[in-house]
């Protein structure tokens, strides 16, 4: 549970520090929460009340084009469908699986063959390096026919590999893994993408399609308690790489 005054302050900081220049809609809505007693009281009543969770829950229920666009519309929506918002917020946690990070991680991978372990893997899309197409200026790597096209500007002496390393084994670990064949889970993952970030959404949709033919295994578990058991499953005769995509990106 939260304090309504603290909720207002938190949402104002979220608007100014995270949404400004990145999402006009979330900027407006977060600012409106910071000035609205009724909505702040509603959010404060939730065990998990972070802004991304609240806004993604609304996007899940409405779809991005139909989200409330003003403070008064948000208040009316919460008044009308607050029970549904509450149910989503209690059942879900925010998830991201930004495959664009693979373009930044790729130059850091050692030559193959590799065994990859990603912690905080979500749906495991960040494990599928060889299924995406990469463009580092005039240098192209990866699957030429991939629906996922990743462009990355390389400045300075970036050691680009001659090809995507061969990956012979991969495994993810996440507290709440996403199954790419679970339509409800996929809809939630897409709802966590901010509404204006259409290119990111297209990348995510393409990566989900690429994963469905042969999805990576993502074990349910905690980094501290369960990582050793995952590492023990990796083959001994290849280079083991353990990563979390936000660390290097």
What are these regions (language model features)?
Residues 1-24:
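Non-catalytic nucleic-acid substrate-recognition regions in nucleic-acid-modifying enzymes
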Residues 1-6, 54-59, 184-188:
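Short N-terminal helix-initiation segments at or just after the protein's N-terminus
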Residues 3-10, 39, 82-90, 170, ...:
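Generic alpha-helix detector with strongest preference for long hydrophobic helices that associate
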Residues 12-17, 27-32, 36-113, 125-133:
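Class I SAM-dependent methyltransferase Rossmann-like catalytic core
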Residues 44, 63-64, 91, 95-96, ...:
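Class I S-adenosyl-L-methionine-dependent methyltransferase module
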Residues 221-226:
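Conserved SAM/SAH-binding loop
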Residues 227-231:
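Distinct, well-ordered alpha-helical segments
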Residues 239-249:
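A short SAM/SAH-binding and catalytic strip from SAM-dependent methyltransferases
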